[in-house]
């Protein structure tokens, strides 16, 4: 169980008058809170103690200690201190039935007592997480989290990918303890298979900052996929080719079938689960090979086109990038280059036309200026003739 923690609050003091005039005795106690299974100390403080009888009783009013002498045979209770200043007892392995008021009684001519209240908290155990029904890609999964016993009622939280999920919680009180449950729903896909969902429980019985957690690994079922990997890119007559059918799916397909189009597999072929071995290749082995896998959620098939070359043939290894994609990229580059060239030619022609227009305009202006100058000169001559 968790370590005991004690929270103490001062009680109202009980003042008792002693028998003799001018004397008074005081008894003071403190309330104690402890986690179930922990250790609690119950203390009675004495003031102006004159040696009178001191009795400690449990909530059932059974005497535990009488003036320092054990009266009840419960070894969980031990007398730690008995002095004129205080009486202190120690309770180990605290239980819910130990909860209640402990009486510290001082017997004089008038009996006086004070009560120390013991409160026992129950820390939650690790939550129990269950799934309502099998999760399938594209659907929803519902998880439930249960803490059957806690006091006070535990607070439940859900986390997924370090983010809190909103759950619906409910609680039921059973005697002194609470049973708390929470449910959460969310949509799942195949990428969620193997993901972690956490249910966390907290209450005051746990140390500050601590919690009890349970991790649930998502099991999401989905249809299979298949892909064929070849042991080499270029094969020639006489080579041995190994084809591997890489299959995924949940549940994982337990049977893989190999075929070659509408023909049967070569007699030399060895099909063993995910691998197909073709030894001593010849041109007659050419064809389209397929692997097929299925589970209850779907079916998958992968293709591989086998081309067996002559031993002396010079060929390039097959690329994983389809030729159509490469051709499309090249066509796009050529188109962009043509667009750039057309734009450059158009800009050049426009700039040249603007320059010729400006030059012609300049010539017109110069002609007009020259004509004006000549006209101006003739007028001057006429003026000279007039005055002569």
UniProtKB/Swiss-Prot annotation:
Q: Where is the Ig-like C2-type domain?
A: 124-219, 224-307
Q: Which GO terms describe its cellular component?
A: cell leading edge; cell-cell contact zone; synaptic membrane
**Segments in the Cytoplasmic topological domain:** 346-388
Which GO molecular function entries does the Swiss-Prot or TrEMBL record give?
A: protein phosphatase binding; receptor tyrosine kinase binding; vascular endothelial growth factor receptor 1 binding; vascular endothelial growth factor receptor 2 binding
Task: Point out residues bearing the modification Phosphoserine.
Answer: 361
Q: What subcellular locations does the record give?
A: Membrane
Record-linked PROSITE patterns: IG_LIKE
- Which residues does the record list as glycosylated? 31, 67, 286
- UniProt topological domain (Extracellular) ranges: 25-324
Q: Where is the Ig-like V-type domain?
A: 21-119
Reading the lineage from the top rank, the first entry is Eukaryota
| Any one Gene Ontology BP term | regulation of cell population proliferation
Q: Which PANTHER family match?
A: CELL ADHESION MOLECULE 4, IG-LIKE DOMAIN-CONTAINING PROTEIN
Similarity comment: family membership: Belongs to the nectin family.
Tell me the function of this protein.
Involved in the cell-cell adhesion. Has calcium- and magnesium-independent cell-cell adhesion activity. May have tumor-suppressor activity.
- Protein name, entry field: Cell adhesion molecule 4
